[in-house]
């Protein structure tokens, strides 16, 4: 291999090492004998994925608590166990979009499965939205969903989302007054 190609290859490797996580293949002439493919290249670490999860959940929590504050209601606390139940429900909604679980049980049993001890509970589900903002807007425009978000009895909340093949999400908010 000549020096020019070696330098080019070294530069490409350095760029790939320090490039953003999401990048698209450049539309350039490919040297003879090399192949390329157009598309998205993603190499997210477990830490990056966890950060993404925390980021959208924090955005959802901020949005919920802003609505509650505007209504004069105390803020909710994000709870890991309630969140586990919400994520379970989001995955289930991807299979069967309903407040009844695929096993025929009520959605509240997801809280039981996650080890949550509660005296009050509620669930909001939403399908095909792509952002927290559009999902919250949809819920706030619905009397029943808005009532769950603003219910004074709830003290804890958890969120789940599951992505479908089209890139849209099934979103779940689970609310609880824990014992």
Residue ranges and their predicted role:
Residues 1-8:
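Bacterial N-terminal signal peptides that target proteins for export
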Residues 16-24:
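C-terminal segment of classical bacterial N-terminal signal peptides
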Residues 30, 84-133, 149:
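Short, surface-exposed glycine/acidic/tryptophan-bearing loops
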Residues 35-95:
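A short alpha-helix/helix-coil micro-patch that ends at or immediately precedes a cysteine
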Residues 48, 70-84, 97-109, 146-162:
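Surface-exposed patches in mature extracellular/periplasmic domains of secreted proteins
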